[in-house]
Amino acid sequence: MAMENPFEGKEIWFGVGSQDLYGEEALRQVAQQTGEMVDFLNATGKIPAKIVLKPTLKSSDGVKAFMTEASANPNVIGVITWCHTFSPAKMWIRGLEVLTKPLLQLATQHHKEIPWETIDMDFMNLNQAAHGDREFGYIVSRLGIPRKIVVGHYTDPEVAEKVGTWARACAGWDASQNMKVMRWGDNMRNVAVTEGDKTEAERVFGASINTWAVNDLVAAYEKVKDSQVKDLIEDYKAKYDVAPELLDSRYDELFIAAKEEAAMVNMMRENGCTAGVDNFEDLGTLPQLPGVGPQRFPSEYGWGFSAEGDWKTSVLVRIGAVMGYGLEGGASLMEDYSYNFVPGNEFDMGSHMLEVSPSIGTIAKPKLAIYPLGIGGKSDPVRLVFSGKPADAVVVSMADERERFRLLMDEVTIVEPQGSLKNLPCARAVWKPKPDLKTAVQCWITAGGSHHTCMTTSVGREAWEDFARIAGVELAVIDENTNARQFEKELELSEMYHRLNNRH
């Protein structure tokens, strides 16, 4: 089993701006040199989607046709623009106003160094990106169109890295726009932060969030073929340290867990869904609260999953899985559980009953085991038990703030647990939040962040910032420079801005 490549067949179109004023020879050089730049960027291996150079943009009609075609093509996930020469910005207005794909403005040039001894006006006319980029930048800012700006010579490794990160955010946005979320049951009773406006979420993020009866899952469970279950069990044996009793005296419970995974996967595929969520309060006649299956949603299928009806976190996990495709690490549901308040040795420990995914990386081979679980009122569930591997990571939550959604992110460092945790029968991760535990927790609570988060170890802050900019959604960030008093003031300004400037 492997996640489908979200970049397969996807393209980023590159539009270079100029004008007929410069003549055929100059325009020929514009196209040739831009082609060299695009070829170089594609060859770096840092940009997961193919960049495709389109004919030079020289007129308002040409720009509008380019933007219209890019917006209508489902394989195009983003547009890069660059002005090799001066390109009058009025000719960009009609095109920019019809663009619906993410935009990146590349401020670069073909030559790396000014040719001090040979530079003349012919060279200046051809190579005036510093001139053209400012003209283009003005009109984009005037129109209020969000875009990522990358500055530097195209051979600078940082340029390709930033373009690549943005391309990942574009893929996350494309996945969000085409996402179907399968809810088995409703929200956990009386819980506030996991609630949210599903209609507004579809308008803002594109994700279609709907409910299927748990009885539908039970019916799918009854239809699963034994051969599919046995194939899953063989996969478990190949990837995990399976507790001996699951292959002997408690094999029936292992079979049930695998059968539940198969049923969930079959329903997801039949309905074209890429994120799912269940609720331990609504299990119908399912034998177990699903454990190992949901844990494998991100790691084996690239799907989002969350618990207790929290579809918002499931959406984030799917987006995180797509953005991080092909990189080390992954995305998972995480929940803050317990603090270590020892001075100088302060940590946050996250976990969940069953659903934390090994996609984030594990210290040792995950153990597939069975333990009692009082919640849910079903038979003992089978689950993966492990500790998250040390890594840089971020935790991201989504909250419904009545008139808008807010994303909240904290940069963290996952560390090894300082003990065996031998009596803790669930997957977990221990981390140091930035800038420190007390400040991070205070700021998180001030911003109304959820106890459920999406933890990503594959992509970090920049990818989520790019995604939030594309979506036009508020993102509050807690990092090493955060000061609680200043954070509260910035949050007030952010609330005011996003209420007044809701471009949706």
UniProtKB/Swiss-Prot annotation:
Reaction it catalyzes: beta-L-arabinopyranose = L-ribulose
Record's signal peptide: none
Molecular-function annotations in GO: L-arabinose isomerase activity; manganese ion binding
Binding sites annotated in the UniProt record for Mn(2+): E308, E335, H352, H452
Pathway(s) per entry: Carbohydrate degradation; L-arabinose degradation via L-ribulose; D-xylulose 5-phosphate from L-arabinose (bacterial route): step 1/3
InterPro entries: Ara_Isoase_C, AraA_central, AraA_N, AraA_N_sf, Fuc/Ara_isomerase_C, Fucose_isomerase_N/cen_sf, Lara_isomerase
Domain of life: Bacteria
EC number annotated for this UniProt entry: 5.3.1.4
SUPFAM superfamilies the UniProt entry points to: FucI/AraA C-terminal domain-like, FucI/AraA N-terminal and middle domains
CC per GO annotation: cytosol
Gene Ontology annotations of biological process type: L-arabinose catabolic process to xylulose 5-phosphate
UniProt cofactor(s): Mn(2+)
UniProt key word Metal-binding: yes
Known function: Catalyzes the conversion of L-arabinose to L-ribulose.
Recorded family membership: Belongs to the arabinose isomerase family.
Name listed for the protein in its UniProt record: L-arabinose isomerase
Annotated source species: Bifidobacterium adolescentis (strain ATCC 15703 / DSM 20083 / NCTC 11814 / E194a)
Origin organism lineage: Bacteria, Bacillati, Actinomycetota, Actinomycetes, Bifidobacteriales
